[in-house]
Structures are given as C-alpha cells and as structure tokens.
C-alpha cells in the first residue's frame, strides 16, 4: 500500500480504511507541521493545526474530489487553519527563546546564527499573511510557484509579485536591523 497514490488512499479513507489514513498521515504530517510552525510561529499551534487538518482529511474524505493534487488541497487546509489561528492570537516567535548552545561548537558563531535565525523568523512573522505564506511555501517547503499559486488560489504571476514584495520587505527590515534601527 506504500506505493498507492494519494488519490487512491483518499478513496480508501472515504471507505473508513484506517491503515490508508495512517499512511497518508506519515506522508504529510511532518512537512505540514513544518509549514504550520513557520506560519504560526510556535510548535504547539503547529501541532494543533495539523491535527485539525488531519481530522478534516478523515471527515471530508467521502466528499473529497481530486480537482487538484491531494498535497495542494491539504496544504491549503493547513494554511487556512494557520491564518485563522494567527488572526485570533498575536505572533510570538518561539525562536526568540533560542536553542541551547552546543558546547562543542564555537559559542560566538552559534549565538550569531541563533540571532540571525531569530531576526529572520521575526521579519517573516511581520509580513502580511499572503506574503508570509508565499515565502514559506516556496522557500521553506520547496514548492514551485505553480504549486504555491494553487494553494493560495491565485495566479503564478501573483505569487511571483508576492515573493518580490516579501523579499523586498525582508531585505529592508533586516537592513534596518543591521543599521541599528529596530
């Protein structure tokens, strides 16, 4: 069953096949949590969002129609749940706490990397929702502009424009931080 297509698995899930659901979950849960973490800004919300998205897969499987690839549909569900959650609660980046330093690593270099990661995460968190989603889907999840466009329900040219604006905003924000502004 590991070679079964996502569409075949959804048909089996619609019939109540729990092993098919577990397989589909194994295929997508990890990347979905990664996507959700980058959008929501914390692990707990990301886990909850993915659990809710997987529940929707199970409950909506009988009504699911393969108008787009399952991955596109599933990421869209995850993204919508993330954006809804972000609208309810303010963004507090988990990266602000940082990871404990590796005692064997150069502490100064590790601290600088952690600070850079924190600043980038904060700058991404400050982007408008659609720009943030375009950046995360394209650069962190490795999706093509066409796949990102399908998830965001927009055109490829709109995704390209979102990416240009997002990168400009990130560059400006990070340059301002380097100059000591924020």
Where on the chain are the PLM-derived regions?
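Arg/Lys-rich amphipathic alpha helix in sigma70-family domain 2
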Residues: 59-66, 76-95, 113, 174-176
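C-terminal edge and immediately downstream basic/flexible tail or linker adjoining helix-turn-helix-like DNA-binding
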Residues: 12, 98, 114, 122, ...
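Helix-turn-helix DNA-binding module
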Residues: 121-125, 129-133, 137, 141-158
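Residues within the DNA-recognition helix of helix-turn-helix
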Residues: 28, 49, 162-165, 169
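Amphipathic, Lys/Arg- and hydrophobic-enriched alpha-helical face
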Residues: 25-43, 60, 124, 169, ...
């Amino acid at each position: 069953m590991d070679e079964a297509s996502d569409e075949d698995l959804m048909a089996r899930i619609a019939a109540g096949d729990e092993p098919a659901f577990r397989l589909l979950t194994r295929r997508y849960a990890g990347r979905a949590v990664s996507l959700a973490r980058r959008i929501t800004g914390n692990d707990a919300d990301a886990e909850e969002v993915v659990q809710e998205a997987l529940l929707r897969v199970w409950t909506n499987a009988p009504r699911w129609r393969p108008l787009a690839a399952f991955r596109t549909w599933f990421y869209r569900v995850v993204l919508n749940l993330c954006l809804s959650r972000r609208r309810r609660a303010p963004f507090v980046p988990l990266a602000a706490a940082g990871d404990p330093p590796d005692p064997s690593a150069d502490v100064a270099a590790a601290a600088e990397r952690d600070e850079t990661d924190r600043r980038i995460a904060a700058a991404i968190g400050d982007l408008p929702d659609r720009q943030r989603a375009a950046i995360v889907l394209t650069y962190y999840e490795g999706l093509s502009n066409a796949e990102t466009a399908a998830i965001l329900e927009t055109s490829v040219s709109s995704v390209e424009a979102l990416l240009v604006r997002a990168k400009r905003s990130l560059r400006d924000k990070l340059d301002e931080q380097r100059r000591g502004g924020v």
